Design a protein with these regions (language model features):
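Structural signature for solvent-exposed beta-strand/loop edge elements and short helix-capping sites
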Residues: 18-552
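Bacterial Sec-dependent N-terminal signal peptides
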Residues: 1-23
Length: 552
């Protein structure tokens, strides 16, 4: 029920009550009839005063009553009882004609479904509604609402709809909410928090333009922030002190934002959170409670799943980023395994916190130090500091060959293969069924591994200057190749193939790769075809240089 409906109900209650019966005196130890200065009759009553109207009974120590106007004032242990409802206050003023009771001082209204305390209460007894002002405390369904003013009306389901304003605080077992104004509809069981609303639960602080709370069976089931959603989450972890010092327990603030937020709860505890529209997260990573670094991610939609830990406290279990996902991982300065920032992007990114793994899918790009990885699918194992890249997730057929992993290191030609494994700590990696280029030649191997900054090892590889690398006109084949960048290539044994047919072999061979320098080794031929000669190889030979400056 909205505010207008609440106020309308209060107005209707006043109108319909005007035809009701008046207060009737039941008892008073002393009754004195007097005429006031305006010539109106007034009853002064003292000692065990008791009045009744319908099901309502008022008792007090003293009071006065204007019978003609139906107005009475009562003080001294004042109490009004109606069925299971009890109202107490320092003093009470009644208007029988309008069925309005005004309570002053230490007001306390207790009902079977709710309780209320305030300094002032305008109470419509027949409609079971009212307006409480001054240090209001309203208790209902496990909630304690404090505010400067509360307007309420009891609904057909016995719960009360209300509007609370002025420094509102809502206390529940699992959470605390604050705002300038809140409206609760008891029939739909939905609260709207307005004017700088904030909800704090399990160390998380949620805020936005508005916060909507939907309850089911007296438990919060869904929290919605329709605009400018923001979450701040306090966490603790150990950081390394200065040299020789012990680790220090420090506080970290995870941060999440989005245009819209939806949080789903089970038994009142967070189960999942979905951020939509320019969503971002800042999440701090720990290993054995020791801070490792921070991860910043953004995308169209970010979904967080929560799970209870050993202490039953809910913590983030996984993060899923969809739609233009991108992020940055910044390792702590004390981290030993990864020393530099990792930049990455993909169509979707999924983090598993307990498994310490990340999965990136479709149009994946990862930049780390002097290396670049482009692929259709990448799995990062943070505990082992490994990246595993393939064109598509396991068990899914490759739809686009261009999604096969392509790995580039500074100073080297790109390498593409069916799969890639790369160690972020030591820079070593391997490519299955990989291809790459060095100078004028192309290399392909069942497995290509790097063992130093300038060394590649190739198993069951081929080398050719033909640009048809997948099906070359000619090539040299070898079980093992060792490529030393900008120096030479060593192969053993080596066989020359023409059109897939072996021509001759050697125990080993050395090919120069000097980027313009002179070096002894085989000179690769070129392939050609014409009407006079047919298919041919031209230029195969061996060059011996006494030193690198010969013929320069």
């Amino acid at each position: 029920m909205n505010v207008r409906l609440i106020l309308t109900c209060l107005t209707i209650s006043v109108i319909t009550a005007q035809s009701g019966e008046r207060l009737r005196l039941i008892h008073a130890d002393i009754l004195e009839n007097v005429t006031d200065s305006e010539g109106k009759a007034v009853q002064h009553l003292r000692g065990n005063v008791k009045f009744q109207k319908g099901e309502s009974v008022i008792s007090c120590e003293k009071g006065y009553y204007r019978n003609r106007e139906g107005i009475g004032s009562f003080a001294g242990n004042v109490q009004m009882v109606k069925n299971e409802q009890i109202l107490t206050a320092d003093s009470i003023r009644t208007n029988s004609n309008d069925d309005i009771v005004t309570a002053y001082g230490s007001v306390h209204l207790q009902d079977s479904e709710y309780g209320l305390k305030s300094r002032l209460l305008t109470y419509f007894s027949e409609a079971d509604s009212g307006i409480a002002e001054g240090n209001v405390e309203f208790i209902q369904k496990g909630q304690t609402i404090t505010a400067g003013k509360v307007t309420y009306v009891k609904e057909t389901n016995d719960a009360a709809s209300y509007r609370a304003e002025e420094d509102v605080i809502i206390l529940e077992e699992e959470r605390t909410a604050t705002c300038g104004l809140t409206i609760y509809d008891a029939l739909s069981d939905i609260s709207k928090l307005l004017e700088n609303p904030v909800v704090i639960q399990e160390g998380q602080q949620l805020s936005g333009e508005e916060i909507h709370l939907r309850y089911e069976e007296d438990k919060l089931a869904k929290l919605t922030i329709p605009g400018r959603a923001h979450i701040v989450y306090k966490r603790e972890g150990k950081t390394n002190g200065t040299e020789g010092d012990e680790s220090i327990l420090s506080e970290f603030l995870d941060d999440m934002t989005g245009q819209r937020l939806e949080a789903f709860l089970e038994e009142g505890l967070l189960d999942s959170v979905r951020l939509q529209g320019m969503a971002t997260t800042l999440y701090h990573l720990f290993e054995d409670s020791v801070y490792q670094g921070k991860n910043i991610a953004s995308g169209d939609t970010i979904t967080l799943l929560f799970e209870a830990d050993s202490t039953e406290k809910r913590d983030v279990n996984s993060i899923h980023v969809a739609g233009g996902a991108r992020g940055e991982y910044h390792p702590d300065s004390s981290a030993e395994k990864i020393e530099n920032t990792i930049l990455y992007q993909a169509d979707t990114i999924h983090y598993s916190i307990p498994d310490q793994q990340t999965w990136l899918r479709k149009d994946v790009e990862i930049d780390y130090m002097d290396t670049e990885l482009r692929s259709g699918y990448v799995n990062v194992l943070w505990e082992e500091n490994l990246m595993k890249a393939t064109a598509s997730p396991p068990g899914i057929a490759i739809s686009d060959p261009e999604e096969r992993p392509m790995f580039t290191e500074k100073g080297r030609e790109p390498m593409r293969g069916d799969s890639l494994t790369y160690n972020l700590s030591n820079g070593r990696g391997k490519v299955q069924h990989g291809t790459t280029k060095m100078e004028d030649g192309y290399y392909r191997g069942d497995e290509i591994r790097n063992r130093a900054d300038k060394i590649l090892l190739v198993d069951r590889g081929i080398y050719t200057t033909c640009d048809r690398i997948e099906d070359p006109h000619f090539h040299f084949g070898s079980r093992r190749m060792k490529m030393i960048m900008n120096d030479l290539i060593i192969a053993r044994p080596i066989i020359l193939y023409l059109g897939g047919i072996p021509l001759f072999g050697l125990p080993f061979a050395v090919f120069p790769d000097q980027s313009g320098k002179r070096h002894s080794g085989w000179i690769m031929p070129s392939y050609g075809q014409n009407a006079a000669q047919g298919r041919y190889l031209r230029g195969l030979g061996y060059f011996w240089a006494a030193n690198e400056f010969l013929n320069s």
